[in-house]
């Protein structure tokens, strides 16, 4: 399944006395001169992903007693597929607060899904009210459980690979194709789903065009199309018959 967005805690704070440029400069050179809100804010306005990662790491180190900074570090590790590190970091985040936090529960639910522990994931998602990505996570969980109609409901009007996949698995090929069409930044998985939609619609040109994009973005994923039954008749049609 396409990756879920992890739950970072971001703040839109009104910082007095410092411009955005000054905050960025200090976050790079002297992060300990910024307060926790300023340093967390720096990560949201960083010009590059590398800078954002640096600011998140600095905040978690300097303000380790603030569960928000530690949760953000864990979310960053989880996004980088560092599952063991993320698990340990979320434990530290939970230990840094006296109250259960929805964001930590949500991220731990993602860890549980990755570990195929759907029961634990469902329990934790039930304690994640208020997290913006909750519907998306519930949708993915229901896809893994085979509850495709419920997954469609969970995603609502979401425009994502996961939402398109739920529609596709529910037999709503046209709706799945429409969702993919409206994704602004398509990746290899987007085009793969689009290719399946085209195959189910009998659109050979669409299959070819979308799989070409898959190959351009992810050659390993493109290879899997060779054994995917969704495309069998289209691949076979390219083989010259024997006379």
Task: Please state what every model-predicted region is.
Residues 1-194, 198, 203-209, 216-219, ...:
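N-terminal targeting segments with Sec-dependent signals, encompassing both cleavable signal peptides
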């Amino acid at each position: 399944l396409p990756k879920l967005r992890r739950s970072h805690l971001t703040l839109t704070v009104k910082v007095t006395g410092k411009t955005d440029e000054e905050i960025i400069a200090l976050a790079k050179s002297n992060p300990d001169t910024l307060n926790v809100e300023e340093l967390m804010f720096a990560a949201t306005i960083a010009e590059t992903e590398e800078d954002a990662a640096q600011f998140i790491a600095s905040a978690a180190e300097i303000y380790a007693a603030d569960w928000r900074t530690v949760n953000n570090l864990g979310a960053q590790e989880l996004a980088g597929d560092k599952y063991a590190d993320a698990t340990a970091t979320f434990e530290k985040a939970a230990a840094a607060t006296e109250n259960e936090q929805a964001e930590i529960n949500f991220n731990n639910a993602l860890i549980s899904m990755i570990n195929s522990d759907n029961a634990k994931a469902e329990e934790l998602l039930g304690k994640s009210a208020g997290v913006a990505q909750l519907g998306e996570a519930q949708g993915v969980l229901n896809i893994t459980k085979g509850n495709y109609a419920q997954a469609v409901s969970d995603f609502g009007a979401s425009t994502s690979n996961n939402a398109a996949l739920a529609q596709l698995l529910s037999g709503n090929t046209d709706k799945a194709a429409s969702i993919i069409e409206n994704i602004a930044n398509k990746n290899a998985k987007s085009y793969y789903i689009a290719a399946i939609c085209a195959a189910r619609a009998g659109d050979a040109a669409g299959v070819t065009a979308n799989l070409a994009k898959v190959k351009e973005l992810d050659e390993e994923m493109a290879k899997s199309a060779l054994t995917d039954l969704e495309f069998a008749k289209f691949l076979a049609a390219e083989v010259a018959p024997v006379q």
